[in-house]
């Protein structure tokens, strides 16, 4: 494998990205990383007409034997719960996230039955799965690493990940807000804190920029427009941009598109365009910026005809060249 591969698995409304890069020091000569894992809800995969499938099914069908690195960009059900299911089959050697490595040890399982709406239920399950994912990683001999803006981490020969967010202040705020939630004993106040943390979680996302020779890939998790403050414009420049927050109206604007100036944009919106993902205005401004648009699923929009597929694979050269291909099956 002379080039890097970045595959966006069709997990419906969610995100799951498989990164593969040549590394002679690894078994099989390939470094593998899974960035988020989509949802673990069975209902997400009842209709598979667009090609969607749980990430662990995709990985198994690909014949993968291990995952060197897993990245949890933030604790929302459509990102972390599928990651846990993948970790049950492929316990990672390393897990990246934002909280201190041992932070999960001070947390306890939360009662999902107290939820008063679907959003609270999803978030409670995500928080519980965060604890389980950390515990599973460590019990299988893996390590947990906390990342903050300013770090650059080598991944394999020629490839590194630069952390653009969260800032030290935001990472500390996430830690404090999480601690306050778990310490709350009043039921009403607990639910208020739960919803507040849920609402803030997107902009606690890890924002990663993968640097591979001249190619730069910007992966902002669910960050919306309010989450890029403090990041220098030149740091956002990228040839491939996974638009934040599933391409909803707050996922990008012209100012952000002008800073990134991508040749290609990937939108991780579901075929049913839940929560108004793949918003037409967002897609229009990204296309107007000169970018080619690609989708992890098949959102139904006028003049958009994305074929059913299990995944979208980019082959990326060190010179910044991109080759995209929809894979009909794993």
What is each stretch, according to the model?
Residues 22, 35-38, 73-75, 98, ...:
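Active-site-proximal beta-strand/loop segments in catalytic clefts of secreted hydrolases
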Residues 1-4, 80-218, 292, 297-299, ...:
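Flexible, acidic/histidine-containing loops and adjacent segments that form or flank the divalent-metal
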Residues 22-33, 40-97, 233-248, 261-266:
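Active-site metal-binding motif and surrounding structural segment of the metallo-beta-lactamase
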Residues 106, 230-305:
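Long, structured stretches of catalytic cores involved in phosphate-ester chemistry, encompassing
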Residues 13-15, 41-42, 75-80, 102-105, ...:
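Active-site environment of divalent metal-dependent phosphoester hydrolases
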Residues 37-50, 178-185, 190-193, 248, ...:
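Acidic/histidine-rich helix-loop elements
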Residues 10, 19, 36, 74, ...:
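Divalent metal-coordination and catalytic microenvironments
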Residues 1-65, 200-224:
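Conserved beta-strand hairpin/beta-sheet module of binuclear metal-dependent hydrolase folds
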């Amino acid at each position: 494998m002379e080039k890097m591969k970045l595959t966006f698995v069709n997990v419906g409304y969610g995100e799951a990205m498989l990164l593969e890069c040549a590394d002679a020091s690894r078994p099989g000569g390939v470094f593998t990383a899974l960035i988020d894992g989509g949802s673990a809800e069975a209902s997400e995969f009842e209709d598979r007409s667009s090609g969607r499938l749980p990430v662990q099914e995709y990985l198994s069908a690909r014949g993968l034997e291990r995952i060197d690195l897993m990245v949890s960009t933030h604790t929302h059900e459509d990102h972390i719960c599928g990651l846990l299911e993948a970790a049950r089959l492929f316990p990672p050697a390393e897990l990246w996230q934002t909280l201190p490595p041992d932070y999960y040890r001070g947390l306890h399982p939360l009662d999902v039955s107290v939820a008063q709406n679907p959003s609270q239920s999803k978030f409670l399950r995500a928080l519980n799965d965060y604890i389980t994912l950390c515990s599973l990683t460590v019990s299988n001999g893996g390590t947990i690493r906390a990342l903050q803006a300013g770090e650059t981490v080598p991944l394999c020969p020629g490839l590194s990940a630069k952390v653009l967010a969260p800032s030290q202040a935001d990472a500390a705020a996430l830690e404090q807000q999480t601690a306050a939630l778990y310490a709350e004993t009043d039921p009403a106040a607990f639910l208020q804190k739960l919803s507040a943390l849920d609402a803030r979680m997107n902009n606690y996302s890890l924002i990663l920029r993968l640097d591979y020779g001249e190619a730069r890939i910007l992966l902002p998790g669910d960050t919306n427009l309010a989450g890029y403050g403090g990041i220098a414009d030149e740091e956002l420049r990228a040839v491939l941009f996974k638009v934040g927050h599933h391409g909803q109206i707050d996922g990008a604007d012209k100012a952000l598109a002008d800073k990134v100036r991508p040749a290609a944009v990937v939108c991780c919106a579901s075929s049913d365009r839940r929560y108004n993902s793949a918003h037409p205005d967002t897609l229009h401004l990204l296309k107007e910026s000169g970018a080619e648009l690609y989708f992890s699923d098949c959102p139904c929009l006028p003049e958009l005809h994305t074929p059913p597929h299990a995944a979208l694979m980019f082959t990326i050269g060190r010179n910044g060249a991109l080759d995209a291909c929809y894979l009909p099956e794993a």
